[in-house]
UniProtKB/Swiss-Prot annotation:
It comes from the Eukaryota. This is PRELI domain-containing protein 2. Pfam families: PRELI. GO terms for cellular component: mitochondrial intermembrane space. One of its GO terms (biological process) is phospholipid transport. It comes from Homo sapiens. InterPro entries: PRELI/MSF1_dom (IPR006797), Slowmo/Ups (IPR037365). The gene is PRELID2. GO terms for molecular function: phosphatidic acid transfer activity.
Amino acid sequence: MGVSVDVHQVYKYPFEQVVASFLRKYPNPMDKNVISVKIMEEKRDESTGVIYRKRIAICQNVVPEILRKSLSTLVILCWKKVSILKVPNIQLEEESWLNPRERNMAIRSHCLTWTQYASMKEESVFRESMENPNWTEFIQRGRISITGVGFLNCVLETFASTFLRQGAQKGIRIMEMLLKEQCGAPLAE
């Protein structure tokens, strides 16, 4: 089955400022769930100018304790007990392609933890707004699907959907705050 969350936001700041703020967004005291972000790889294609980055984020496990306990007692294959969600942190991998010439950045993220039971993927784009070239449009689609935990698949997907929506809104608020702090008031129409 799976659940999807779509986000669309226009930042009234130039593309370069928005991307710079995005790349410095975490860790941040406004979102204590993101513990650290580390650049694993960064390279520039000299012919196109595209900058590729791979980052790993370490985040707190936000699955409620009641769901962790329920799932930790599941018996899977050979009657072996597994602790599916009893981990303190999760890892996310983010890849981005920044094209300064065309003023766009594509981002793909996925979860490296729980891959046997869950698939979490996000695709995002920052691009110059068609409405105003001094503004930046942000479009994101996130998808989570849970398998292998029976009737709890739906419960976990519902929780994940709510968490994704709230996280997206929190991310937008953090970006707006950072942009205002670093760049001043938004640009007028």
